[in-house]
Amino acid sequence: MPDLLIELRSEEIPARMQRKAAGDLKKLVTDALVEAGLTYEGAREYWTPRRLTLDIRGLNARSADVREERKGPRTDANEKAIEGFLRAAGLSSIGDAHVHSDPKKGDFYVAHIVKPGRDAEDIVAEVMPAIIRDFPWPKSMRSGAASAKPGSLRWVRPLQSIVCTFGAETEETRVIPFAVDGITASNITYGHRFHAPEAIMVRRFADYADKLEKAKVVLDAERRKEIIGADARNIAFANGLELVEDEGLLEEVTGLVEWPRVLMGSFEESYLEIPSEIIRLTIKTNQKCFVTRQPGAETLSNRFILVSNIEAKDGGKEIVHGNGKVVRARLSDAAHFWKRDQGDLPDLETLKPSAEKFGLDLGKPLDQRMAKLDALNVTFHAKLGTQGERVARIRSIALALAEVTGADQALVERSVVLAKADLRTEAVGEFPELQGIMGHKYAVLQGEDAAVANAIEDHYKPQGPSDRVPTDAVSAAVALADKLDTLAGFWAIDEKPTGSKDPYALRRAALGVIRLILEGRTRLPLLPFFDVALKALRTQRPDLTGDIAADLLAFFHDRLKVYLRDLGARYDLIDAVLTSEADDLLMIARRVEALTAFITAEEGKNLLAGTKRATQILAAEEKKGTEVADQVDERLFRLDAERTLHASIKLASDDAREAIGKEDFRSAMAALSKLREPVDVFFNDVLVNDEDRAIRANRLALLGLIRSATGEVADFSKISG
């Protein structure tokens, strides 16, 4: 079967857009072909900085004929109706129609229409111009002489050529002719911009990829990535060093080169006095280079690794020299930031009111930066006030949390008032991703307690499902307070996540709170701390009066379900223990854990079956309007099974309630498991729907006691199975 090769070659595509663009090309083309009636065996996309390529294998040469039967009017219909039918069906005369008979409706005309299939080449030529014109680039531009015309092509960078060939492996391929803005599809591409700029004639994918490789273009991005990673590790190893792995940088650099060549440069060792994080980001952000270190060491070496797109005649000496000059200049700037951040600010007198407000020591550089942050009224959010106001709110929440968690209040308060100070440092101004990290370093330099320095860095954590969770009590209190203020604040101004949109990362903040509580094994009822957060906010913004606690708690429940589900818990078991007012996340998780263990054991499965039978009977009766009593009358018992079940329920309920009081949910489940046998015997021996209405009502009340007893630990009616 024929194969289809498409290449869209342009000026350099931004690295961050390449992978998605190639995927978009594959989806748009294959969807259009399938919609037109074609099928294919497989498709794979490729990309380099200058081209998007699509290889479609086993594409039908022609779409199948479509047969359609169109029903017309009765044979005795008027002439106007018949003429309309002929026009709609595309028939020249009524003699071309068939007559069908229906016992009820009589004879009527039917047109058998055959829509012939189309050649795949015609379909491709038809769909490709629209796909190219409407391509979903995040940003695009017009270029060339055609750009002055209305409706001219927009592409991420100027589009230079289009390859589109079609044909079976056993025959010569054909160019599918179409044009977009004066660019006509052909079988001509070009290799590396510098090493092989000559035109290359290609036939099908294997030939295309092979010729590009000879023209210094590695088409497969994953292979380029492997080459860069392996060569970088090897050159580091050869110099007695190890590469500091950076998957994000590796992905970006892969999108910057078509013919990767890995080289090593160096800078003066004196720059190693700068924190490693600053060195790494300086070299990564500005020069797209990797850093190295001694094997097993934390600190960096003065060697960096760069990736070139050309094979230089001098072995890369000039490239290394040029990159080294830029790296040294950038590191010189970074050293300047680092030293300035440790010095005094020039306007300390004006910072005294802010210093008094937060108990800051203006003799210390980090305290000065916090005072400056407050004095400048730097906005956190237009509706939520300044960063200084936010720090004041976080302080209130963190001190309340410290009372519950047992964290040292003085250390918590000191951590909070310095937590955002590094936002006014030059290092964080240059590299915002270092916030918290630089605060930690400056705190250590000015002699802060280790718990304070750690809390400054850790209060942003965890920032995702795989990020480390702070375990120190001070760090945990500040991290929780920071996130609770964020969530309560944005809920109060009705800036909640909607659908896939979450501009303030509130889902991540809620997950952070959940992980801090569960992984820290912290007993922390959320509702009281929502109140603390809202009270702190309303002290500053009295106009924010809405009650958001119930809605915010429901949001936490949703995120908790996702978190527990990712850990393997069943949704139905989570729902079974979750009530709308439950705000102790650790207790919810423990209940789910205990219920999971119980319900997967034989005793639990059997009790579940009996309990569900009881709740179903009760639900049916209550739907009819029957009121089920919450007490039973032992005088109405007629069978031993009733008496035994009643006694067992009382004993199991007492034991379960006592275990729950001790927060021993496994023992509570074990107590309930003793109901299994008496419940089974009851349903085997007792007819609930007795003719005597009093006995029937009493037996329904007995079923109600089963529901109440099991309801102490979970709503068994929500458990599937």
Swiss-Prot record:
**What organism is the protein native to?**
Sinorhizobium fredii (strain NBRC 101917 / NGR234)
Identify the enzyme class.
ligase
Q: Which PROSITE patterns match?
A: AA_TRNA_LIGASE_II_GLYAB
**Protein family per UniProt:** Belongs to the class-II aminoacyl-tRNA synthetase family.
Q: What is its main location?
A: cytoplasm
What is the protein's given name?
Glycine--tRNA ligase beta subunit
Alphabetized, the UniProt keywords read: Aminoacyl-tRNA synthetase, ATP-binding, Cytoplasm, Ligase, Nucleotide-binding, Protein biosynthesis
Q: Which GO terms describe its molecular function?
A: arginine-tRNA ligase activity; ATP binding; glycine-tRNA ligase activity
- What InterPro entries does the record point to? DALR_anticod-bd, Gly-tRNA-synth_bsu, Gly-tRNA-synth_heterodimer
Q: Per the UniProt record, which EC number(s) apply here? A: 6.1.1.14
Instruction: Tell where it localizes.
Output: Cytoplasm
Q: Which gene encodes it?
A: glyS
In terms of NCBIfam families, this protein maps to: glyS
Q: Which GO terms describe its biological process?
A: arginyl-tRNA aminoacylation; glycyl-tRNA aminoacylation
Q: Which reaction does it catalyse?
A: tRNA(Gly) + glycine + ATP = glycyl-tRNA(Gly) + AMP + diphosphate
Gene Ontology cellular component list: cytosol
Quaternary structure and interacting proteins, as annotated: Tetramer of two alpha and two beta subunits.
